[in-house]
Amino acid sequence: MKKKCVCKRVAAALLAAGMIFSAVGCRTTEAEKENGHAAEQDKNGEKDSVVVTMPTTSEPEAGFDPAYGWGAGEHTHEPLIQSTLTTTTADLKIGKDLATDYSVSEDGLTWTVTIRDDVKFTDGEILTAEDVAFTYNHCRDESTVSDFTMLKEAVAIDATTVEFHMDHPCSIWPYTMAVVGIIPEHAYDEGYGQNPIGSGRYVLKQWDKGQQIIFEANPEYYGEAPKIRQVTVLFMEEDAALAAAMAGQADVAHTAASYSEQQVKGYELLAVQTVDNRGFNLPVGEVTEKDGITYGNAFTNDVNVRRAINLGIDRDEMIENVLNGYGTKAYSVCDKMPWYNEDCEVEYDQEEAVRLLEEAGWKAGADGIREKAGVRAAFTLMFSNGDSVRQALAEDTANQLKELGIEVKTEGVGWDTAYDRAQSEPLLWGWGAHTPMELYNIYHTDASEEGIGAARYSPYINETVDNYMDEALAASSVEDSYELWQKAQWDGTTGIIQEGDIPWIWLCNIDHLYFVREGLHVAEQKIHPHGHGWSIINNVDQWNWEM
């Protein structure tokens, strides 16, 4: 029945996809259609273009302005149209793009960056430190999707030197510099996001909103000339993306684990490892209320309950049954990152999980569900409406925890209520970024007046963990900060892992899957962050067709 259902959806999507391709007018010759080729050829007869599908949610609603999410938004990626000061390497260390050098003052409050003097925007104007300062001050003042509150001011010292004056030390600033695209001060106006001018590898050629975006190689790019000269991005749901591959109308089509067994003639399945994790919070603290929001949870406040849940989940089973094997076990929000602490890892041990619950006084009742002092071992595990993977993970979690005597009800919710409810009820989240700031955002005490003086997304307080993260931000270099981020996870005595407070349970990192046309060499991918979208074409300029 499952396969029949998939086939029906694909058949419908084929029809829809055909309508899309007619509407956007994909430039595919009859000969190419006959051979199932979407790629175009250059004047030498070599293919130099690709057609890539992405989820509809990947289309940048506000356009290509870094202040409003392009590159530096919720799902970080390289901005393509613009240059950045730094880059991240394959092993997630820091490299250089516009920057030729950078340093930080002894007190950590001033970053000095020198930039190349040979870079031009696509309108012919030279890119200078004034443009860099303008970009960052603009993001500080206007960004609604990224946190630039640590930046006090960016100042151009001369044409090739910019200083970033910080409100507090931020050793991981180079990771921010890797995703903020530099925009031209002289050409910036309210319409910039729709008609961007940059200095990156590609220029925006065409944007048919709701359908496609076409990029062309920047002929004046200062780096190595892109091997792929035209990139067409089609926005569609997974059903339609599969149909596009089956019809030969896409060279790279994003897909999901539920479609991974589909055989598409002329295509191979590419699985990219990620730190796109799924996990859920377990609120810590006694139940209290502030401003109409409930905080804490009488059941999950017990650290032995949290430890039992972490041990009692068979992540291998979950990956096999929910993700068709396309994922890796997650033990933190930052698995495989340079700042990851391997002490986070645990082995599935149902017997030990039961023992922890028993010793903590959680005894099975007549219906098999545990109780203690009138508190039932039960909670609701929320997931975002319409996300079938999160729903399946939530239901699998509920089934597994029932074997421990824990009752879990699952509920689809909207984000308009999920954030507040997560202060007292577990919510299945998706995280994963190329910066250790994600650890800070999840586990560090929120200093704002909102909430109860605990971590932002779920009640949790540990001053030692806070101190390590504060020290990490104040470190003399990003490399020196790694050990401190690792100690924040576990220092041998306290932390956020199994032997510590374990306020979050991490389940899996979801592989990003793509159907790739045979003959197309997709350059080696660095670990993808959260978001099955733009990351795949971070290095599209290095792809090539094998003739």
Task: Spell out what each predicted region is.
Residues 363-433, 512:
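Ligand/substrate-recognition segments at binding pockets and active sites
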Residues 208, 212, 310-341, 345, ...:
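Detector for C-terminal structural segments
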Residues 219-263, 407-409:
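Ligand-site clamp/hinge motif
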Residues 128-135, 159-163, 200-201, 229-230, ...:
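Alpha-helical secondary-structure segments
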Residues 69, 89-93, 169, 175-226, ...:
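Gly/Pro-rich hinge or "lid" segments in bacterial periplasmic/extracellular proteins
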Residues 54-104, 197:
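N-terminal lobe/hinge region of extracytoplasmic solute-binding protein
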Residues 52-54, 124, 245-246, 252-255, ...:
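Periplasmic binding protein-like
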Residues 103, 107-110, 146-186, 519:
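Surface-exposed binding/hinge segments that line
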